[in-house]
């Protein structure tokens, strides 16, 4: 999921900058992103142990107390997302969802309209277009923060997050691992 979403975002950014001839590809990637996000939200409720929101969303008190570990070299290992990573995941999913949904209502005023552009007033379409463009800047800030956090955990805290993200495996007690799913075999 992660790499599909990252590549879809990168492709959307490139096609948005490349010009109108890439608008249909940009729209396709927007649909792809929306599909991935809806899948991830569903997977957050019915997926494997460490993918479920209930496994990594903590109370504000626990979140703020965990911040002391975030900026120290002392490590607090988590098999799945830690408290800050869990809430960052929800934030990133949310802003990408706003981006994908707002794109459904906008137009380039020349050739391409989102599928719901004509179903809303000009004021709503204008609001959605502004949101789509301003939200992109927020996404860039969150991507930079995400990459910085990965770098800090990788090099400052010596946690092999990059390897875990590439291979989908992280060292830890076997009891905390994901058991093979038998659901699809039925």
PLM regions: where:
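Membrane-embedded alpha-helical bundles that constitute the cytochrome b-like, heme-associated redox core
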Residues: 1-186
């Amino acid at each position: 999921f992660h790499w599909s979403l990252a590549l879809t975002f990168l492709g959307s950014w490139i096609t948005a900058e490349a010009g109108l001839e890439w608008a249909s590809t940009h729209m396709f990637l927007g649909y792809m992103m929306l599909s991935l996000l809806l899948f991830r939200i569903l997977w957050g409720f019915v997926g494997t142990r460490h993918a479920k929101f209930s496994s990594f969303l903590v109370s504000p008190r626990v979140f703020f107390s965990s911040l002391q570990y975030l900026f120290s070299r002392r490590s607090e290992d988590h098999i799945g997302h830690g408290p800050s990573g869990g809430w960052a995941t929800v934030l990133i999913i949310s802003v990408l969802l706003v981006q994908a949904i707002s794109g459904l209502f906008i137009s380039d005023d020349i050739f391409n309209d989102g599928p719901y552009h004509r179903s809303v007033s000009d004021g709503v379409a204008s609001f959605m277009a502004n949101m789509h463009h301003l939200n992109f800047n927020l996404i860039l800030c969150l991507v930079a923060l995400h990459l910085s956090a990965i770098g800090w955990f990788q090099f400052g805290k010596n946690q092999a997050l990059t390897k875990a993200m590439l291979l989908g495996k992280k060292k830890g007690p076997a009891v905390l691992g994901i058991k093979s799913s038998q659901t699809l075999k039925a």
